[in-house]
Amino acid sequence: MTAILVTGYRSFELGIFSEKDKRVAIIKKAIKRDLIAYLEEGVDWFIFTGNLGFEQWALEVANDLKKTYPLKTATIFAFETHGSTWNDRNQQHLQQFRATDFVKYSYPSYESPKQLKSYHHFLIHNTDGAYLFYDSEHETRLSYLVAAMKEQPCYPLSFLNFERLNDIADE
């Protein structure tokens, strides 16, 4: 069994506030290519953390790919309270994460930064690599997880970046 952690920018960090934004289609096109490549290499699980944006779009693509590939999806939330303050539209996206093949919560609620460090450790040590939409020139709080991943020997990271998206948009 091979499991890949999928994470990246949240929609608001990209300035995307509508599913109709043309950038979403370009991002999904890149995701589809990359997930198919992973599946052809033998990956069977894609693991998500439940964030809107890149993860949400990757989950949608993975669900479409389930029609032709034998893959499983999982969501490992940091907290049971994840998404509790989201609006109705975003609650629908949250339900997609809760409908994956496996769902687990690390903690009931946030109490200290140690929990996030422990959560990141768990994600890294229970996956075989990561697929990230992240660029170190455009840092977000995801930088803490990326730094922890880079500290691990033999933990492969595959990045989707803005340059590659521009190439896909130009096709």
Swiss-Prot record:
Alphabetical list of Gene3D superfamilies matching this protein: 3.40.50.450
InterPro entries the record matches: YspA
Organism superkingdom: Bacteria
Similarity remark: Belongs to the UPF0398 family.
PANTHER family reported in the protein's UniProt record: UPF0398 PROTEIN SPR0331, UPF0398 PROTEIN YPSA
Name of the featured protein: UPF0398 protein Sez_1569
Organism: Streptococcus equi subsp. zooepidemicus (strain MGCS10565)
